[in-house]
């Protein structure tokens, strides 16, 4: 375990790169409906810090949780896995 403790990581796809040093990443997950036992796809969009502006739309990326960087940014870019 690192000195910062356990930080969550997630995988997603870049859906917007229009901001400076920030990309929007869409993360999909499957949840099971409690009554019908059917799996439903849910998604969330996170603003992610991209220091060098290397991400492009459609890139598959891995993001890691960090301290709050702004009002909406709480994730850092870990790696691009294209």
Swiss-Prot record:
Q: Please tell me whether the keyword Transcription is annotated for this protein.
A: no
Do you know which PROSITE patterns this protein is assigned to? RIBOSOMAL_S17 (PS00056)
A cellular component term from Gene Ontology for this protein is: cytosolic small ribosomal subunit
| UniProt keywords, alphabetically | Ribonucleoprotein, Ribosomal protein, RNA-binding, rRNA-binding
Note the CDD domains from the entry: Ribosomal_uS17
Q: One GO molecular-function annotation for this sequence?
A: structural constituent of ribosome
> Is the Ribosomal protein keyword given for this protein?
yes
Q: Where are the transmembrane segments?
A: none
Please, one GO biological process term?
translation
Family designation: Belongs to the universal ribosomal protein uS17 family.
> What is this protein for, i.e. what is its function?
One of the primary rRNA binding proteins, it binds specifically to the 5'-end of 16S ribosomal RNA.
Q: How does it assemble?
A: Part of the 30S ribosomal subunit.
The protein here is known as Small ribosomal subunit protein uS17
């Amino acid at each position: 375990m690192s000195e910062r403790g356990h930080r969550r990581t997630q995988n997603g796809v870049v859906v917007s790169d229009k901001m400076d040093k920030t990309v929007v990443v869409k993360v999909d997950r499957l949840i099971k409906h409690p009554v019908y036992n059917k799996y439903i796809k849910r998604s969330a969009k996170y603003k992610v810090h991209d220091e060098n502006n290397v991400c492009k739309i459609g890139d598959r990326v891995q993001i890691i949780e960090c301290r709050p960087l702004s009002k909406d940014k709480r994730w850092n870019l870990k790696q691009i896995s294209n």
